Each structure stands twice: as C-alpha cells, then as structure tokens.
C-alpha cells in the first residue's frame, strides 16, 4: 500500500472507525516514512502512531558526501546521513513518546569523525531499548571506532539482535547481560579485543540458541566460538587477506545440533566440541596462504551427525587434506554429496565404508564419475541424483552408478533446468525409464522430476 492510496483511504474516513489498536497494526505494516506522514492528517492519527510497534529507519533516501580526512591516506568520498535524516528519526521517536515497541531496524552511514552523529545513533538505540524492544536490527557503516550504548548490552527484553556491517566496535562493557537473547546475527564486525565475541558478548547471553557470524573482506575474523547453550550456528567467512598458515578455528559448543560452515581449510582446529551435532553443512575452500591444511580434527568433531552436506569444494578438501583418515560416522543416515573429479568419488567410497547406517544418498552431479571407482557394500535405500542434463555419457554414468547399490527402494533423478526445452526433458525421461527401469530391482521405485 503506497502513501497516496493510504492518504486517500484516510481522507474518506474509510477506516477511522476501527479500534485504535487495529489502526496501529495497519500502520506497522507500511513503510515507516509513510506511517509517520499520517500524523499530519489529524490529531487522532498522531495518537494512533504511538501504537506502531514496528519501525524501519533507513538513511538511503537522505545521504550526503563528505571527504575522508584520515592523515596519510588517499582522500576519498564517504556518504553519511544528513541533518534531515536526524530530524526525521528524532521526530519519529518523539511522536511515539514512551510507548512499547517490538521491532526496530536502523540502517545508517555514520561519519568517522563526527561524534555528534555517533551520539545520535546511541541515543536512538537507547530510546527503543528503554521501551522494551524485542527485535533489533542495526546495520551501521562507520569507518571509525563505534561504541555500543550501555543500555543495549544490558537489555532485559531483547530476543533477537542483528549487528553489522563492516563495523569496528569499541571495547565492550564487562557487564554484558542479555538474559532473554535467543538469536544473534553478527555481520562483519571487528571487536576491540579478538576475544570479546566469545568471552564477553556470548558469555553474557545465557539462553542464546541461534548464532550467525558472517565476515566478508574485512580484518580480524573471529576464530573462537564458544557457548554452553547454542543449538544452531552459521559461519560464513570470506576473508582471503586475513588468513595464513597460523590461522585456526575452535568450536566449543556441546549442545549444538545444526552447523553451517563456509570457510577456507585451515591448518589447525584447536578445540572441536560438537558432541550433540545432528546436521552439518560444510563448504570448505582452498587458500594459497595456508601452506599445510589439515581438516582431520574438524571432520572427527562432526562424526556424530545424522545428516551431512558436502559441497564439491569440501569433497576435494577432505579427500586431499583429511590427513589422518576419516572417522567412523556411526549415526550418519543422510548424505548430500558433490564432486568435481575422480578423487571425489573415491572419497564417497570411503564415506560409504565408514557409514554403515547410511540410507539416503543425494548426489549433486555425476560429473567425473567413472565405473572404475567401485563402491563398497552398503545399505543405501534411497538415491537422489540432481542436475541430470540428458547426455549420452550421463545415462551410462547413471546406469553404472546405480549398479553399485543393491538395496535401493527409490531412485529419483532431477532434470537440470539447463536441459532447456520440454521436448528434450520429456525425451530424457523416456530414455531413462527405458534404459534404467529394467535394471532396477522390482521393489525399487524410479522417478524422474
């Protein structure tokens, strides 16, 4: 609903008969800038705006260019929020008085040297924290040191917090206490002390269950994640300039059940405590500055998983740099696997050997598979092939690959979108049904999607 339509409805008195609480909910569903504009219609709407419990403030409509005056560095232009944006935010918060708020989102560009702008941001955050905010999304771009207001790290009501992006935080207070926080998303944050994430921030979150740590093209990548309560973790690092042979990673997370980890392979994994892990998704790449990669301890640390997802890059890394061999995956029943070459299929054979309970195998592509890589005896009952393109070589590969599994009850082949026109897809399906249908056990279902 745009502002003009909303103003038209209001001017016709089409909804003013609704209860104020309902009108407040309606205003919460439209962009904050338009919701604020309704306060100009009549005194009644100024009162109703106080009931809006969801605010999204973004300075993208009001930026000004300033020159970076950092001594010794090449001068370049940065963008920061304008005085008009400051007035708009101050007015918006003032209109609401001290009414409770549930969700607050602030996206702004802060001047590196303007302490007045930094103070404004701190005041805005303290305002909504003082009103009992539940969910807080702060995306602040500040090339200088930015200190979080004390009220933020002592909130009793905050349940979900997002902090970013490319932000250098000043020293955190030692009294961080977020007793209700269950979800934390950190996007490219540099902490004043490298241990502040683990030893100060996470230590002050006694009921935290979900954590996402993303770090892209920036310095000071967090290398230790520890929490006695965490259940879900997503780590996405892409910082080639911040990695070398001394880089390491540590996960001390005894209650973690879900891990998504995207990073380059490192030389050391100091402490991997993931005893409760149920599902893991690994995307491990190569970095030339890491001279001796070894992912053995990481792979041993995830050995209790029931579901494992390996990207093609991860398969290559594990085959080449799990230097002390694969552990036994005693609980593994679901495996999603991608390979780029013959080495990857050899790793699959080793995984089948070490995973005697495996029932479901998802193969992302048959690229590189040859019949001379034989699979050990296994109990796989469900085989799912992704990315089938309908080539003659793939039919041969698929027929050979299926022959390695004697206990199959279901084979499903997904045709890739690249197998362009419908005629080709239909032909591929008919070919597969004819060529493979007769070679499958009678109890096995065969599907092409």
From Swiss-Prot:
PROSITE patterns reported for this sequence: FBOX
SUPFAM superfamilies documented for this protein: F-box domain (SSF81383), RNI-like (SSF52047)
Keyword Amino-acid biosynthesis: no
Domain of life (superkingdom): Eukaryota
Keyword Repeat set for record: yes
Alphabetic keyword roster: Leucine-rich repeat, Repeat
UniProt xrefs under Pfam families: F-box (PF00646), LRR_At5g56370 (PF24758)
Gene3D superfamilies documented for this protein: Ribonuclease Inhibitor (3.80.10.10)
Positions of the F-box domain: 12-64
InterPro entries according to UniProt: F-box-like_dom_sf (IPR036047), F-box_dom (IPR001810), FBL60-like (IPR055294), LRR_dom_sf (IPR032675), LRR_FXL15/At3g58940/PEG3-like (IPR055411)
LRR repeat ranges per the UniProt record: 161-188, 191-215, 216-237, 239-263, 287-312, 340-365
Protein name per Swiss-Prot or TrEMBL: F-box/LRR-repeat protein At3g60040
Organism from which the protein derives: Arabidopsis thaliana (Mouse-ear cress)
